[in-house]
Amino acid sequence: MEKTMSLGLVGRKVGMTRIFTAEGDSIPVTVLDVSDNRVTQIKTVETDGYTAVQVAFGSRRASRVTKPLAGHLAKAGVEAGEILKEFRIEADKAAELSNGAVIGPDLFEVGQKVDVQGVSIGKGYAGTIKRYNFGSGRASHGNSRSHNVPGSIGMAQDPGRVFPGKRMTGHMGDETVTVQNLEIARIDADRKLLLVKGAVPGAKGGKVFVTPAVKTRAVKGAK
């Protein structure tokens, strides 16, 4: 399967709010700050074996930047950022960009479907009821100290092991999650904000990656 190559934006999750349509309908949206996405490197087939654009987002103190990275950023003429993200794109699109160029929210348009990737909120060590929606045991009537246990996790000597993938207690959350086909409800070009319909992974202040949707659904009845 060929990987879809498209340019995206790095952003910060500001939080959730709601907006109203002209008809008065309330739409829950997540506000994403995508300001100051700056190009730090253009990778080409001749120099790197593939075509991509490296983007920096956020800011970082000079004292917290390693010397190799400082030299890399100085070559591009950009300030250090919290994150360096690489987007694989077509060669003709890469030719339109240059080091130091700023990619703004006008990369997208209202109504466009996007995929948003982030790190989900960590929940710590959780049991199977919270982690996998297991049912609990009976509260009484013959049940003694087995109210929230997950049950059997395997068999006896044959096979003599717990099968991989068995749903058990463990660390919940703090995983990379991608939510697909979210619609851009509004774009605030002045403040460099994207308002995306629905929820996106992560806590307030978390970093997210916004890219054009790879599984856009065809309009029903369209030819």
Swiss-Prot record:
The modification N5-methylglutamine is found at Q157. GO terms for biological process: translation. The keyword Translocase does not apply. Keywords: Methylation, Ribonucleoprotein, Ribosomal protein, RNA-binding, rRNA-binding. Residues 137-157 are annotated as: Disordered. It holds the Pfam family Ribosomal_L3. One of its GO terms (cellular component) is cytosolic large ribosomal subunit. InterPro entries: Ribosomal_uL3, Ribosomal_uL3_bac/org-type, Ribosomal_uL3_CS, Transl_B-barrel_sf. Methylated by PrmB. Signal peptide: none annotated. It comes from the Bacteria. One of its GO terms (molecular function) is structural constituent of ribosome. Part of the 50S ribosomal subunit. Forms a cluster with proteins L14 and L19. One of the primary rRNA binding proteins, it binds directly near the 3'-end of the 23S rRNA, where it nucleates assembly of the 50S subunit. NCBIfam families: L3_bact (TIGR03625). Belongs to the universal ribosomal protein uL3 family. This is Large ribosomal subunit protein uL3.
